[in-house]
């Protein structure tokens, strides 16, 4: 097993889409790359930075930062395969994104999530994220949070 976190490149697209096709149904939604998830076809244009956790070249996790406004970064696409959960890899992905946002000079990071994502919520809380009012138009999100640096 050779696990690393690397910046996204087009060469990872098929593996990423395969991972999302397996991962998304487990969290209650299908992966729809030709529908509501079409933006994943244009990762470099849609995200400021995007990372993949790969195990022997196969994508097993992801996280991204998107510029929300001049002072605010938005954390997106935090997903990790079931088999790697509970081993610190989710925290490593999260650290990668939060460190990047801090290094880029953002004053805060926001995110949206679902109430059912209990493990993710524990991670957010452990970093000091606090609940805020709805800040975006994501009709699927139930929880909105921010971390102020």
Residue ranges with predicted function:
Residues 3, 7-77, 81-83, 94-95, ...:
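Acetyl-CoA-dependent GNAT
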Residues 14, 87, 118:
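Loop/helix-junction capping segments adjacent to catalytic residues or to phosphate/diphosphate-binding pockets
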Residues 26, 49, 86, 99-103, ...:
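Conserved amphipathic alpha-helical interaction elements at protein-protein interfaces in regulatory
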Residues 70-72, 108, 142:
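A generic structural signal for beta-strand entry/edge sites
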Residues 80, 86-99, 122, 126:
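Conserved acetyl-CoA-binding loop-helix of GNAT-fold acetyltransferases
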Residues 91, 103, 115-133, 138-141:
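Conserved active-site alpha-helix within GNAT-family acetyltransferase domains
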Residues 101-112:
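Conserved GNAT acetyl-CoA-binding A-motif
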């Amino acid at each position: 097993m050779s696990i690393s976190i690397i910046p996204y490149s087009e060469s990872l697209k098929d593996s990423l889409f395969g991972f999302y096709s397996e991962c998304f149904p487990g969290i209650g939604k299908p992966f729809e790359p030709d529908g509501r998830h079409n933006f994943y076809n244009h990762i470099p244009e849609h995200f400021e930075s995007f990372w993949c956790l790969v195990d022997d070249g196969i994508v097993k996790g992801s996280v991204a930062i998107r510029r929300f406004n001049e002072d605010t970064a938005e954390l997106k696409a935090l997903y990790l395969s079931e088999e790697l959960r509970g081993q610190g890899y989710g925290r490593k992905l999260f650290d990668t994104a939060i460190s990047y946002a801090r290094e880029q000079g953002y004053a805060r990071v926001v995110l949206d999530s679902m109430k059912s994502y209990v493990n993710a919520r524990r991670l957010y809380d452990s970093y000091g994220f606090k609940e805020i009012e709805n800040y975006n138009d994501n009709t699927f999100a139930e929880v909105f949070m921010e971390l102020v640096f």
